[in-house]
Amino acid sequence: YKVRGQERGMDAQKAMSVYRIVQESLNNVIRHAEAKHAWVELDFTDSEVFVQIRDDGKGFVVPANPAEFPEKGHFGLLGLQERAEIINAELKILSTTGQGTIITLQVR
């Protein structure tokens, strides 16, 4: 993992949501990605925290709309999206078949 910037605290609900999003993302890497490597990066600025979880696994086709996650069997991804929305954070999931997945979280 890598941390950039000055670490700073955040309220308990945000901190727990960020922790759970990272935890579920890494669980997905272990369970589904068939990855050799995974990386977690945290970037602290004065007003935001950026979190990136990335792997070199098999990747997948990301549905255009998060509401489609359950239809495609991606219940964990729906949970990530819901947790991000609760804390007014922005979550992006990028993946390419055969090239891995990148999950980014922007917390204000």
Model-derived features with residue positions:
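Coiled-coil dimerization/phosphotransfer module
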Residues: 1-108
